[in-house]
Amino acid sequence: VVSPKQQYQEYVFQRIEDYKNSLARDELLRLGNDAALEIQDATEGQYFLTEVVMQETVDDIIRKRLRLPSFKRWREKHAKVRQAQKSPTHWGLERNSAVAAILPRLEAGDRALVVGGGAEAAAYLLAAHDVHLTCLFGDDRTCTRIETRMAAESLTGNFEAFVAMLGSWFPSLDQPVHLVVIDAGTLATLPSPRRVSLMARLQDATVPGGIHAVMPGGGGAAEAWVSLYPDWERIPVPARSTRTRGKRESSPGVLMSRPFPPATSHASTA
């Protein structure tokens, strides 16, 4: 699990990089000149300017401009923010959604895979629960948007994302995953051969007893894909505790559990 200090360092790094990326070339050059002058003033001209010294000075200038908090101040605020981030409703998810229902089964350090931009909210929620999160998206824009939001929310500690032609390429995973969240809308857009290939890879990458949560999104119905799990067990999703008058019930999604392999029988020699 990533320590608070590492999370803080990642937060500062990402804020600084985002600031640099927002500057035009002439502004970057002026920033470099400011850094060189600051180094010269601080050392009364007796210095050996290296790339490392320049980079550190530039980062310090940006940190002051952005008024980034100290680690102590950030940690105090971060604890309150992280508590809010762990709530499904913080990300616009219903408390009875399939992903919310599976949260009690997860532990920090578990591995999860999220597929499709329509499952964006689930990605943030899982990252807030300190799982090792891998995301697969079909386009650069979605990936960039989610990476940027992850960084802004200080959720990048155990997060990585890939852009791929879904169903044609699959990342090499160090270990199988405990949870896969799939955007039904993304599945609906794939040609059948690629959809079947993607689902086969996702199922193979899941530990026995692991869970797939198929979430409605982008006009795709989760129920439409239950047939892709012929040997898996369907897990009931808790019903909504209260109903809103006049409001149409939204689908919570579908939960499927990978079966355990049959126990190997050993002949008795007694």
What are these regions (language model features)?
Residues 90-109:
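Conserved alpha-helix/loop element of class I SAM-dependent methyltransferases that forms part
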Residues 108-118:
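Conserved class I S-adenosyl-L-methionine
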Residues 169-180:
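A short acidic, Gly/Pro-enriched loop at the edge of an enzyme's catalytic core
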Residues 194-208:
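A short glycine-rich, Lys/Arg-flanked "PGG" loop and its adjoining helix->strand segment in the class I
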Residues 1-90, 266-270:
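N-terminal accessory regions of S-adenosyl-L-methionine
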Residues 208-218:
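Conserved beta-strand signature within the Rossmann-like core of class I S-adenosyl-L-methionine
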Residues 220-270:
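Class I S-adenosyl-L-methionine
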Residues 119-131:
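Conserved SAM-binding loop of SAM-dependent methyltransferases across substrates and taxa
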